[in-house]
Amino acid sequence: NQKMEVSTVQTHLHTADYLQLEDQYGAHNYHPIPVVLARGKGAELWDVEGKHYFDFLSAYSAVNQGHCHPRITEALVEQAQKLTLTSRAFYNDQLGPYEKFVTEYFGYDKVLPMNTGVEAVETALKLCRKWGYQKKGIEQGRAKIIFASGNFHGRTLAVISASVDPAARNDFGPYMPGYVVVPYNDVEALAAQIKDPDVAGVIIEPIQGEAGVFVPDEGYLADVKKLCTQNNVLFIADEVQTGIARTGKLLATCGNCTCAGHCENKYETRADILILGKALSGGVVPVSAVLADDEIMMCLKPGEHGSTFGGNPLACAVAKTALEVVRDEQLSERAEELGKVFRERMQQLIAQSPLVTLVRGKGLLNAIVINDEEDSHTAWDICVALMQNGLLAKPTHGNIIRFAPPLVITIEQLEICCNIITETILNFKKS
């Protein structure tokens, strides 16, 4: 009876009840928009009160294929009824076929499967150091990796050691040695540091998403890759947020590639080590991956790196289907076309409102800059107003609002959302 009573109470909880539960029992390491979501389909969400919203965050670009995509959830359920986890102590019948599929899909020799994005980043950093010692001949304990200022690669101690964001870094020292930070989008600064013979790698986000959707100058990534090649340094691309069709290409480092899911070109911005995550599973389970060619990946030997859950059969079945959806539904092309529509509408808004000063982005990874100080709460207040009007987005770095809907959003839905954003901002009054 007691269990039945608890169940009955839970089904009648309201928004305020859920907020109170998280506040009382959860760590206070997040500051969410005050909406409690209960259901999703495609680009749409519904809260516990039944109110409808359009999703314009996509779980930080993890839900590129849309919420609860039927093909992906079918793959999840089908595999979950057979086998979910074996660890890597044994082979399973999903991993090998998935590895073949994903390496051919992105055009690399080998893949190392992990779970979360930051796990994949750490894996790439370890692999880079290993290569530096074994292949480049760097003296033990001296390997360096160059990062770009404004980066966001996750929350672990290793990667926050290269962060310049006080919120991510303060009070978490001592920090990991062997990192050098140079300004983003500054080829000359990179050129000055990369000549150091102890540098093993350069890790770059093709577009800095968390920093506010900063798009580098045309040719920047090609120059980075060229410098890496000239100095025998590995180019590491963190495409956890930008990859898998989000920016209008399969990868943001693809340049003009139109492979639509079967990369055969050794393009001029091709990463030596590619990091993927988030949308690799369509937002269903944590799946990430590190891809590289044999000369790099085979530096790792059994026992030197691993993950209990990495490469599990459930993740492999889901990820393979999620990538098939990207290819079959031509989500790269959709993101490219709809992104142009969105930015054009936001440019019109800039002409109408002094509150918005800039729109930037690629594909369906975009942001608007609010005309206020970075430490102001204006962008937050606008996002709350957007929520009240049926659209969910989140500010980043105070005065920037990131807009990244699922790539399955229709042109009709996108136009409705642009209307919501426009009307909300035109009617917004600073408190």
Segments (PLM) and residue ranges:
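Conserved N-terminal phosphate-binding loop of PLP-dependent enzymes in the Aspartate aminotransferase
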Residues: 5-431
